[in-house]
Amino acid sequence: SGKVEIELVQYKPEAVDIFEQFQDEFNATHDDIYLKIDSPNDAMTILKTRFIREDNPDIIGIGGDINYSNFLDADMLMDISDFEGLNDIKEKYLEMNKDLEYVPKDGVYAVPYMANAAGILFNRDMFEEHGWEIPTTWTEFTNLCDQIQSEGIQPLYFGFKDTWTTLAPWNAIAVSLCDSDLTYQVNSGKTTFAENYREVAEKEKALLTYGQK
């Protein structure tokens, strides 16, 4: 066909529909390029296997986690410093990319294209019905949970069906209590995770008393 085929493998199967939409829109507007987006269920295992076999996709869509750090450390990713689209990305997100490097490297190796928010969803109707005030501090939050529990209502519901969702409350607490460069401090021998995560773990444990059994 004479078209250049670009393969993108991304690791969020729950986002298949939107990525398929991106694929269709791109292909409809580019006559000389065919974009193929794969969203396999076990994407990370598949990616690691393909890297070992040197069957690398052109683009990968993964999170800013340890897998990204490992791929970067193994020199699996290409420097894209000359990509003009980087000018449209907030500097803070690019700095977060650099924070994921085990050893500081020159260049840019990822394009941040989305950000997640950690928070708590609440039933507004129930709050209005019971006269509960929206808490703004940890103490106000736990006091409210105690009050709700005393009224015979389960205060919290945790989405722990998948293991990764257990990180949501942990991350939200840790980012407020720990230094942003904690990993670097630990790697340089200045401190330990055990020392810094104790309060985080205690607060996470406290939350569990308000959730489902």
Task: Identify the residue ranges that each predicted region occupies.
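Immediate post-signal peptide segment of exported/extracytoplasmic ligand-binding proteins
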Residues: S1-E7, A28-T29, K105-G107, E128, ...
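Hinge/lid segment of periplasmic solute-binding proteins
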Residues: G63-A118, T142, A168-N171, N196
